[in-house]
Amino acid sequence: MLRRALMAAAASERVRDVVTRAPGARAIVNRYVAGESSEDAVAVARWLRSAGLLVTLDYLGEDTTDAQQAAATATQYVHLLGKLAAEGLTEGGAVEVSVKPTAVGLLLGGGTSPREHGVRVATEHLERIVIAARDAGTTVTIDAEDHRTTDAALRIANSLRSRFPTVGTVLQAALRRTEADARELAAPGTRVRLCKGAYAEPLAEAFDSRHEIDRSFARCLRVLMAGPGYPMIATHDPRLVDITRSLGFALPEGSFEYQMLHGVRPDEQRRLAASGAKVRVYVPYGGDWYRYLVRRLAERPANLALFLRSLRSKA
């Protein structure tokens, strides 16, 4: 119930105005967001790499219906990749980028669901980013958003992967369709990130309880880990980390990776990396941090309590 209410708040402009102006908001945001500039993102990536961690960077922003903004977001990624390459951070895919299709034009053409014009624009911008990533020695993961964009996002990823095989895609265990998608994507060389999902979805499309989502995650995890692809297991849940570790014992070294969010269980990230596991940290940056913050609060109620205490103390 609390999680669904917070997800609804992520879409509320009134709540957004209150939260973004709150004196305690910035301190909480700084735990999870690298900063607002590409220089901030590069600095955090450099720091994480020095600790033996891999990185994926996400320029915050989504649901754009402005063609110029979509193009500007693509340009931001291209410039970021150039800066990362200049510092030697992209070698071997050590630092890659994650891109939300709606940030680069998927919803252009009107409405809340993708249309052909938006799919075409997003594909063109994503191809530009993928080429820049390839030239920098790294790759791109096409992020997942709410269920209305899933078919279009997978279609774009499949199209790009036919020419750029390292392009990754993301599946959300909260969606009822995901186990079938996992079976289809468990193919040689396919990079698939499995996460729980962080969007408010209708019950017809998604599981509602944490227990159901966890069970779905475990089923999808087993499908991906048994396949010939490259699973990227995005979870902080100790039980799911343990299941992943158990399934990974029989696999060749380096054939899968863990992924965790910047600022969430950093000690566990380093512990896993020190044990020899590949661990990639998902690092967002940019000024459009509100929805990202709300999703993090929804996932971890303790963070919500901390945030509310901070607001009261600084009011």
Give, region by region, the residue ranges found by the protein language model:
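Positively charged, amphipathic and often flexible ligand-engagement surfaces
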Residues: 1-315
